[in-house]
Design a protein with these regions (language model features):
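Transmembrane alpha-helical segments of integral membrane proteins
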Residues: 157-172
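Juxtamembrane boundary at the C-terminal end of a transmembrane helix
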Residues: 2, 196-204
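Selected transmembrane alpha-helices and immediately adjacent juxtamembrane segments
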Residues: 118-123
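Juxtamembrane transmembrane-helix termini in multi-pass membrane transport proteins
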Residues: 2-75, 127-152, 162-164
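Transmembrane alpha-helical segments that form the membrane-embedded catalytic/substrate-channel core
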Residues: 88-92, 155-161
Length: 204
């Protein structure tokens, strides 16, 4: 089976839905758009897309099989990711209104930081494994992995950009200190809530 047009279109829809729906990346981009603006959030966006591209390729080239052989590695990675996500939620919750000088000194998540985060992002792993296991034909497998990863990246970048843009549009609405604090606490809470699948699995 080759990567037909029908299969590619089906995958493109999968990539769009999973990229644009809420998750840790998009929640952080929305908060970054509000706190730093769109332009300063661009490295964060590019880091997400490039880091995710590498993750999909790695899963396709055998990293998934390594985790099946050594499940403890995957478990450790997931809990490290959960701990990092809680740290990011804490940072967002405590990022209050800033003066112009404070905004210039404060730093949004960097390109490398966003790229590295994909390796501990539970939703990114689910997306990558789903793409490889469901939409990658075995005939011409390695070429298809690259195509799948590239198409995912092409769709992912504008999808996550929508969230950063929405955050930027909200800046004028959230000039009031109280509303901005409530917004940041809300975004932090959503990040914590995004860990519920891991918690359910841990206690099941």
């Amino acid at each position: 089976m080759t990567l037909s047009l029908d299969l590619l279109l089906g995958f493109a829809l999968f990539a769009l839905v999973t990229s644009i729906t809420p998750g840790p990346n998009n929640t952080m981009l929305l908060a970054s758009g509000v706190n730093f603006g769109f332009n300063r959030t661009i490295p964060h966006m590019l880091g997400i897309t490039c880091g995710f591209f590498v993750l999909v390729v790695a899963v396709g080239f055998g990293l998934g099989a390594v985790f099946q052989t050594y499940p403890l590695l995957y478990t450790v990675l997931r809990y490290v990711g959960a701990a990092y996500l809680l740290y990011l939620a804490w940072k967002i919750a405590h990022s209050g209104p800033m003066s112009e000088s404070q905004q210039s000194e404060a730093k949004p998540i960097s390109y490398l930081g966003a790229a590295a985060f994909q390796w501990v992002n539970p939703k990114a792993w689910i997306m990558a494994i789903g793409a490889i296991s469901t939409y990658t034909p075995m005939q011409g497998y390695f070429t298809n992995v690259i195509v799948i990863a590239a198409v995912f990246a092409i769709i992912n970048l504008p999808s996550v950009g929508v969230w950063a843009a929405c955050g930027t549009l909200l800046r004028s609405v959230l000039k009031d200190r109280r509303w901005l604090r409530l917004f940041n606490w809300g975004m932090a809470a959503l990040l914590v809530v995004s860990l519920y699948p891991l918690l359910l699995e841990s206690f099941s």
